[in-house]
């Protein structure tokens, strides 16, 4: 629409807010899970799809026919452990709890955005990457 790519796009900032909030929420959830979840950090690889029809609809002096919004955020959350090993079930449970508690994820869902983030251990991610 404009600019010279000298700064982040607004949608990139929304994704950055989601990642930051989910990192903080994951740390909180891991700390309070029993037995404690040995979380070191989570690496996110996310992509967003947006409906631009509302933003670019003409004529400009009429209300757009649809809302301009994110339709979908998808990708992976790759969990790195501080020690030991964890079951896939516990990693997936961590992801579910984070998604349930993250305020930014909740705001996106409330706007009608579909979130499809697959939580997996770093080792699983590397194994899956080699197979694909």
Language model features with spans:
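Extended beta-strand/beta-hairpin segments
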Residues: 1-16, 24-132
């Amino acid at each position: 629409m404009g600019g010279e790519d000298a700064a982040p796009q607004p949608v990139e900032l929304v994704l950055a807010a989601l990642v930051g909030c989910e990192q903080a929420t994951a740390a909180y959830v891991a700390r309070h899970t029993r037995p404690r979840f040995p979380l070191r950090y989570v690496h996110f690889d996310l992509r967003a799809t947006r409906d631009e029809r509302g933003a670019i609809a003409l004529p400009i002096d009429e209300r757009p026919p649809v809302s301009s919004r994110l339709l979908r955020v998808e990708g992976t959350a790759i969990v790195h452990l501080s020690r030991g090993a964890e079951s896939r079930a516990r990693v997936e449970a961590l992801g579910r709890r984070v998604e349930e508690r993250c305020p930014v994820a909740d705001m996106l869902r409330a706007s009608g955005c579909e979130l499809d983030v697959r939580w997996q251990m770093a080792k699983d991610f590397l194994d899956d990457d080699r197979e694909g």
